[in-house]
A protein has these predicted regions:
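N-terminal beta-loop-helix "entrance" segment that forms/cooperates
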Residues: 39-59
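Glycine-rich anion/phosphate-binding loops
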Residues: 53-67, 107-111
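N-terminal basic/disordered segments at the start of proteins
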Residues: 10-40
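Conserved mixed alpha/beta catalytic, RNA-binding, or beta-rich assembly cores of soluble enzyme
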Residues: 20, 28, 107-111, 123-210
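N-terminal amphipathic/basic-hydrophobic helices that include classical n-h-c signal peptides
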Residues: 1-9
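Short glycine-rich anion-binding loops that position phosphate/pyrophosphate groups of nucleotides
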Residues: 80-83, 183
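A charged helix-plus-loop insertion that forms the helical arch/lid used to bind
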Residues: 87-107
Length: 210
């Protein structure tokens, strides 16, 4: 009964840029799931979809009302959500209430913005499900996927990196670290993984944990 009830519930899709959002949407259509989109992409790329809504991130009241109006209590995020220009953002009452948290999070990077939105939705009794709930094929199982295998020293470095990563992640919204010989070589800041990698010397041969 629960499974049947879940199947008929409408899924809210918070979609941003990148191919990932399109892959998720394609699968949801293939599975004949009922859905609606809140388009957070830069150039409104889902506008041709009849179920798509373009709502500013500052209009939290409007977003929450739409989710409830659609009789939905589950949403997922897919794709890169463009950081808004806070100076020109139009707010509704809920937006005014929650915006200080989002501005604070934006200083830590994109991942922090999404984590804050998830917290806000939880407060409003809206559950955020995994981005790959309908695309389990996009996740890899535990194991080795390359010819190179980690040695004992690498495994120790990885353990240290994961401990450091988890500790940091509780305080800050760090998405990646690089380790080598039990030393943390670099941590990702709000500029992203690419920028972190570009700061490393070409032959540093570290291990990326993300």
């Amino acid at each position: 009964l629960f499974a049947h009830h879940f199947q008929n519930k409408m899924i809210g899709l918070f979609l941003g840029d990148s191919d990932f959002s399109e892959i998720v949407l394609k699968k949801i259509k293939k599975l004949n799931k009922k859905y609606f989109i809140i388009d957070f992409s830069k150039n409104n790329k889902f506008k041709k979809d009849n179920n798509s809504h373009r709502i500013s991130i500052g209009k939290f009241g409007k977003i929450i009302n739409l989710i409830k109006e659609k009789n939905s209590n589950k949403v997922l995020f897919a794709g890169k959500i463009a950081k808004p220009k806070f100076s020109t953002l139009r707010l509704d009452l809920k937006g005014i209430y929650y915006m200080p948290d989002i501005i604070k999070a934006s200083k830590l990077g994109d991942a922090a913005i999404i984590k804050t939105i998830i917290k806000i939705l939880n407060i409003e009794n809206i559950k955020v499900i995994s981005s790959i709930s309908f695309n389990p094929e996009l996740a890899v199982k535990n194991g080795n996927y390359t010819k190179l295998k980690p040695n004992m020293n690498d495994n120790n470095s990885i353990k240290k990196g994961i401990t450091y990563f988890n500790k940091l992640n509780n305080l800050d919204h760090v998405q990646a670290v690089i380790v080598k010989n039990n030393t943390i070589l670099a941590t990702e800041d709000r500029q992203g993984t690419k920028k972190m990698l570009s700061k490393l010397k070409k032959k540093s041969e570290g291990i990326l944990i993300k």
